[in-house]
Amino acid sequence: MAMVVSTWRDPQDEVPGSQGSQASQAPPVPGPPPGAPHTPQTPGQGGPASTPAQTAAGGQGGPGGPGSDKQQQQQHIECVVCGDKSSGKHYGQFTCEGCKSFFKRSVRRNLSYTCRANRNCPIDQHHRNQCQYCRLKKCLKVGMRREAVQRGRMPPTQPSHGQFALTNGDPLNCHSYLSGYISLLLRAEPYPTSRFGSQCMQPNNIMGIENICELAARMLFSAVEWARNIPFFPDLQITDQVALLRLTWSELFVLNAAQCSMPLHVAPLLAAAGLHASPMSADRVVAFMDHIRIFQEQVEKLKALHVDSAEYSCLKAIVLFTSDACGLSDVAHVESLQEKSQCALEEYVRSQYPNQPTRFGKLLLRLPSLRTVSSSVIEQLFFVRLVGKTPIETLIRDMLLSGSSFNWPYMAIQ
């Protein structure tokens, strides 16, 4: 039976006494009674058309009045955390809506983060979502106050899968449903990106053949383990699980390659595929290098969007829950799971990247082109040394059926 998540409302984020001194001098502006429609004032209706926010910001909102300059100045105040346009004073400092929400969420849920670099990451409009540890560190450094975050009704910090079993007609609660769903997607990752290997994080480093094969095995294993631990997927019939992963494993592999900035230099890839040791016609070499170029282009286009971890998790869920797989027992259910993942991504992008209205569309447009990377080419490039002629689809089926870590014949995954 589907469960309906009851909606909840956050308390006001404004800190008492955080507005300027002009607010206390201006008389309060009466607002409409609860439930009454808002009717904007027009000249001749007896009374200024200023809003409470305008009154608090400038005292007197008339052109040339004493509050006009101050109001204009406030409109250009930057967020002290990332430099974006400030929406007002939140938790003691002028910040944008994104940093306000991030700080509130981090404090209320008592979240702890880790930095993948040297704990000195740049925090600005373009990089504020790259490192949550350094973003929270800067929030506290500039003077945002933990004690100013009001405690209100909070969604569960450990949501269960049942909480997300909503029917298509049920409204999605953005805070409890979508953020909780993304948290579960992220928590399902068996390997943090940094654990794919230090060489993987250095795009200019030319990896050896063994390192390439080991990294490829880790990424494939990571995709299967992630799918096995995300919401809803384990509840599907095992035949449906196998069908979905057998169809989408190569797309998940490309997404993982982009997420960990996998070096894709031509020479070691050809060596890993064994093509340097076998005679090949010139046409076949050109064709194979063209496949490598397509792979490189897809990875680079994803990296150019600066996709963060939450977005990658949502994109992988959208790819995984596809109704294109053959032999699905419940196509409509799989389609609904894809829609839920897409809604989660859309709301996340809207809240975390409010100044990039086209970002959600750009992310979705990257998905169809992932299929231009041939799965057979990925097998030849990365897995022929590991498993020989054994199809990857067979290995995926064995991993799902075994229910435990799969032991590769080439090396052990830890």
Curated annotation (Swiss-Prot):
Q: Which domain of life is it from?
A: Eukaryota
Outline the segment boundaries, as ranges, of region: Interaction with ZFPM2. Answer: 117-414
NR LBD domain location = 177-403
Tell me where in or outside the cell this protein is found: Nucleus
Q: Ranges of Low complexity compositional bias?
A: 38-57
- What are the record's GO terms for cellular component? cytosol; nucleoplasm
Q: Which SUPFAM superfamilies match?
A: Glucocorticoid receptor-like (DNA-binding domain), Nuclear receptor ligand-binding domain
Q: Where in the chain is the DNA-binding region found? A: 76-151
One GO biological process term is: positive regulation of DNA-templated transcription
- The Pro residues compositionally biased stretches are 27-37
Q: Which CDD domains match?
A: NR_DBD_COUP_TF (cd06958), NR_LBD_COUP-TF (cd06948)
Renumbered to this chain, region (Important for dimerization) spans 337-414
Q: Which UniProt keywords apply?
A: Activator, DNA-binding, Metal-binding, Nucleus, Phosphoprotein, Receptor, Transcription, Transcription regulation, Zinc, Zinc-finger
Q: Where are the zinc fingers (NR C4-type)?
A: 79-99, 115-139
The molecular function GO annotations come to: nuclear receptor activity; protein homodimerization activity; retinoic acid binding; RNA polymerase II cis-regulatory region sequence-specific DNA binding; zinc ion binding
Record-linked InterPro entries: NHR-like_dom_sf (IPR035500), Nucl_hrmn_rcpt_lig-bd (IPR000536), Nuclear_hormone_rcpt_NR2 (IPR050274), Nuclear_hrmn_rcpt (IPR001723), Znf_hrmn_rcpt (IPR001628), Znf_NHR/GATA (IPR013088)
Q: Region Disordered: list its residue ranges.
A: 1-72
| Compositional bias segments (type: Gly residues) | 58-67
Among Pfam families, the record links this protein to: Hormone_recep, zf-C4
Q: Which family does it belong to?
A: Belongs to the nuclear hormone receptor family. NR2 subfamily.
Physiological role: Ligand-activated transcription factor. Activated by high concentrations of 9-cis-retinoic acid and all-trans-retinoic acid, but not by dexamethasone, cortisol or progesterone (in vitro). Regulation of the apolipoprotein A-I gene transcription. Binds to DNA site A. May be required to establish ovary identity during early gonad development.
Give the protein name, as stated in the record: COUP transcription factor 2
Chain's gene name: NR2F2
